[in-house]
Curated annotation (Swiss-Prot):
Site feature (Essential for stimulation of [3H]ryanodine binding to RYR1) residues: R64, R66
Secreted keyword on record: yes
Keywords from the UniProt entry: Calcium channel impairing toxin, Cleavage on pair of basic residues, Disulfide bond, Ion channel impairing toxin, Knottin, Neurotoxin, Ryanodine-sensitive calcium-release channel impairing toxin, Secreted, Signal, Toxin
GO cellular component, one term: extracellular region
SUPFAM superfamilies: omega toxin-like
Annotated organism of origin: Opistophthalmus carinatus
Name of the protein: Opicalcin-2
Domain notes for this protein: The presence of a 'disulfide through disulfide knot' structurally defines this protein as a knottin.
Cystine residue pairs: C36-C50, C43-C54, C49-C65
Region (Essential for stimulation of [3H]ryanodine binding to RYR1): 55-57
Function: This toxin stabilizes ryanodine receptor 1 (RyR1) opening in a long-lasting subconductance state (40% of the full conductance state). Furthermore, it triggers calcium release from sarcoplasmic vesicles (64.2 nM are enough to induce a sharp release, and 50% of the total calcium is released after toxin (100 nM) addition) probably by acting as a cell-penetrating peptide (CPP). In addition, it has been shown to dose-dependently stimulate ryanodine binding to RyR1 (EC(50)=3.2 nM).
GO MF assignments: calcium channel inhibitor activity; toxin activity
InterPro entries: Scorpion_calcine
């Protein structure tokens, strides 16, 4: 085998592994962000909301994220 073929193969394998790892990180980020619905999620404490703001809304005594 030629040394250049080995180098090209190594580069292709490295790029493939890098792309797969980047896709996994992106999916994890999307899952974390998808769990946050600020105007719909009920909260008991300020840290339950993604925006860190928990206030009473409307006449209902329950609190929702703002």
């Amino acid at each position: 085998m030629k040394p250049s073929l080995i180098i090209v193969t190594f580069i292709v394998v490295f790029m493939t592994i890098s792309c797969v790892a980047a896709d996994d990180e992106q999916e994890t980020w999307i899952e974390k962000r998808g769990d946050c619905l600020p105007h719909l999620k009920r909260c008991k404490e300020n840290n339950d909301c993604c925006s860190k703001k928990c206030k009473r809304r409307g006449a209902n005594p329950e609190k929702r994220c703002r």
